[in-house]
């Protein structure tokens, strides 16, 4: 007899991927609980939905639980994992639970080293505007929905497919997007780029024969795997051979304007697009969404409206507005999750296009010692060539042990030797808000970048300066 699963407990509930799955299951009627090491806005929001949350991991948190879901950050010696094993409660990896969710709808999976979250969000937004009411699970907060997941009534589920731990190989989509393939999370693949490429091929081969692969052929590695595909392919990019192609691309403030040519199958009329995102990399992300829309016959007007009204994703080129600088002027703070050299370069280039002639101040917290080691020279090259001033924090370890010559000070020294910028090393991330306030000048664009605790910095800068403004005003009124 099939065991009825009613209560599902998530270990690491505060993570973007975990919280989204939990919320969808909660809306499906399951009893959901979960724990995380520290409290967060995500936990508080889920608690507000009626999900039982715990701060800290303890065996006592598992009460009448039928299944446990773990993220890759949760180790086998976690007390809740040990308690579940002792009680013979199934312990399920996050990706397997996501795969179970996808079985009930037609899955659209977005994979790639860079741009997954934004592309997933754009696809979900286009489908929603087209009246398809998709379910979605995204690795970031979709601003228009106020959440990173939603249970829709339509036939489709749009998910972000994670290659970092090879867990995307558990998914069985009917449509898959690959934005690019780059060297990251190489420890998962035995530091062999061939293994990484093969994983993407295997991921695409998991689709049924009637599935569609939507591939960015601007990416050289994606082009290399095209001959290995047996399913139908739609290519997209800026290159002349792409079936869904952008031409006449131009930056207009913090937006991108372009014309989309659509030649996958029957040639469709050119589509003029106003994308409410900055950067050429986001034009590619939008083309992926347009390619999906063509496959699903989403009306052109809905595609145009979804892209022009797109309000972004949390921690992706997220503006905190203009703030008072010490010299009497104003500066702008923008946060971005980018933490790989390719992402840093794309985001800073987007900032150049959106704010021409402005000084770019990069406040950067490297993420993981292993990535800092593997991409060290690329970080030096990208930061030196794209930023006008640099505030550099120590590496966010993400559970890793420090690696000699792959720390923040070593990166600062290398940038100094390169000679294009004079970095300021900020020993503690807690001191970064003050360092930003001290460095910012009138007209500056301060880019806070990284996947770690630097995400808390912009709000602290805003709070500091608002407090100072209140004190000044009170002094003037006294």
Curated annotation (Swiss-Prot):
The keyword Cell division applies. Pathway: Cell wall biogenesis; peptidoglycan biosynthesis. It is found in: Cytoplasm. Keywords: ATP-binding, Cell cycle, Cell division, Cell shape, Cell wall biogenesis/degradation, Cytoplasm, Ligase, Nucleotide-binding, Peptidoglycan synthesis. GO terms for cellular component: cytoplasm. It is an enzyme of class 6 (ligase). It comes from the Bacteria. It holds the Pfam family Mur_ligase_C. Cell wall formation. This is UDP-N-acetylmuramate--L-alanine ligase.
